[in-house]
Structures are given as structure tokens and as C-alpha cells.
Amino acid sequence: LRGAAAFEEWTDADTLVYTAAAPAGENVDRESMAVEEQDRTRMTEVLKQAKQKGMKTVVLLNISGPVEMADWLPYADAVLCIFIPGCMGGVAAARLLTGLAEPGGRLPVTFPIRYEDTPAYPNFPGEGNDAYYGEGVFVGYRSYAKRKLAVQYPFGCGLSYTDFSVELCENDFRWDMRTQETLNVPVRVKNVGSRPGSEVVQLYAREEKPHMLRPDRTLVGYAKVRLAPGEETIVNVSVSKKALRCYDARMDKWVQPIGAHKLYLALSAENILAQAPLMIEGKNPYPLNGESTIGEILENPRAKEIVNQFTNGMFDMIPKETLDFMVYRKLNDILSVGMIQVIPDTVKLSAILQGLYDRLAEL
């Protein structure tokens, strides 16, 4: 149903298909997340009337990006987001709706509940000719996860005409980046439905103790698998080093974090099926030195031991309650003040501290 077509003309049908639009383009940004005006004024009412008549209702979203759906979604039995599919989009949509083809795609964006929920909302459209991108690293699904904000449909979401069981084949992962370029994560997938179909297995990861502000989880790998009814397979989802890199503005370069991570098996950014620890080994982009915090030193048993050797057991002498208040203090600040009283010769003290920092950098 579209344009001037009258709903009354469709009273002999058992299913109503409503196509809604929300066009946009380069230099034609939308001012809201609403569908077109003609759809906004009649869409909810038409769907509501169809449901009252006992009809099935389907909404085709011929859109350029996410739209608000709260007003009409309760009256839609199914929603097929075709975005802007081109001149053969109608044929493709018909094949999908009639079951001749399967909707195997997954959302490349998040559909928020309200326009005001979007991470760009406070800064858009900017002032004059200036547009301020204030989201930082929290773009898209990363922002909603960080704010623990409910969404209409999450990034990576999508259905097919069958069901799948998806599970990790292992429950613990180690990755030595010095010898392995990629990490292969085996996932068992089975089509437990009655039709052939496809599933997109997604892997997200988070660094347990990041050195900077990081998203709660980031997509690091995915794989699409198509299976017949009852068919089962193991798919290896490949994770590259690049997928785990992050940019450190203080160091003005890309860094490769190592250490403890969490790996998430998911079917969307919000539909987490399982999680497993991931320990990454490699060259530390943040070698321990005088600029390291007391907390970072204490997290490394070997580093704590080295500091104790150079300071006659400093960490063993300081009460735990006091150490808890010092975790964010820099090691150099603590040692410079504390050791100058014992070693007033600044040249000798500097040599001792440099020796300590050299030992820490070797870890």
C-alpha cells in the first residue's frame, strides 16, 4: 500500500504490505528519524485498521537509515528493511515476502527507540558551517552498549525463515600475536528449523583493563554460514590483529593491546550467546616505567618484586589501606619523594631509579 491507494480497495486481501520511505542523500541530511510525512500521517491508522480486520501486516522500509518505529510497530506482524535497493528492489522484496528467497542480511546500524537516543543527537547539526563529532570512540552500537540504553533493533540484528543453535567449541582462548597473525575461533552452528537458511555468527571483544577509554565491546569478526534443515557444521571465525587495535591519542599512534580480554559470541551487538576469556600475548605497547601507576605495578607480580628489590621492600612496608589510595599515583612521583630522604645524592638516586625503570621495561 503506497501513495494514493485506498485501504478500502484491499478488503478482500488477507495480508497488507505497507511500504514506508525515508529518503536522504549527500548534503540532504534528515532533520529527524521519522518516515516521510505522508506515511507519518496515515501509516499507523492503516496498520491498525488492518489488524482490526484480522489481516496480517507487513511493513517494507525503503529507507536511507534508521527510523522511529514505536508508533506503528505494535500493529506490524513483520518488518522487512530493504533500505534503498535500486530498480529491482520490488522484485527482490516480492521474492523475500513469498519465501522464494531468504532475508539473510543483518543490520549494519542500530535502530534506536528515539532520535534523542542517538549518540550524535547533542551535537547535530552543529553551528554554522561547523559540525562537531562529539561521540569519540562511542559511535553506533558502542554508544548504546556503554550507556546501557535499550534500542529498537541492535546492530547485527536480523531474522531468517529458520532457527539455529550456535555455540562456542572452546571455552578458553590464548593468542600469541608474536607468532599468530590471526585467531581462529571455532563455532558450532546447526539449523534446527524446517527450512534452509543462513546465520551470521558474530564475535565481539573487550579489553579487561584498558589504558584508555574503550567501548564495552567491539565487533572483531563474523562469518556467514548457510545450512539445510538439520545440517550442522563448525565455522572458524577469523579475528585479525587489526580488529583489536585502538588509537591512543596520548601516544599519537595505533597500539595493539595485550593481556586479558573477553570474547563474546553473539547474533547481534545485544544478543550475546556466550563469553570466554581471551589472553593475548605480544609486545606490550605500554611498557612499565616511571610513568606507570602504582596500580599497574601491583597488577604485575614480577614488577612488584623488582620495585621491592630496589626499594628494600617498599610495597611490603606500606599498609594495604594506604596502597589502595595510591593506585593512580605515578611510580616516579612516589619514589622521587620517598627515596630522596634516604639517598640525598640526586645523581646517585637518578641512576638507581633509571636502573629500576630499565628492569621494568624488560618485562
Question: Over which residues does each language-model region extend?
Answer:
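C-terminal non-catalytic regions of proteins with extracellular/luminal or membrane-system context
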Residues: 1-363
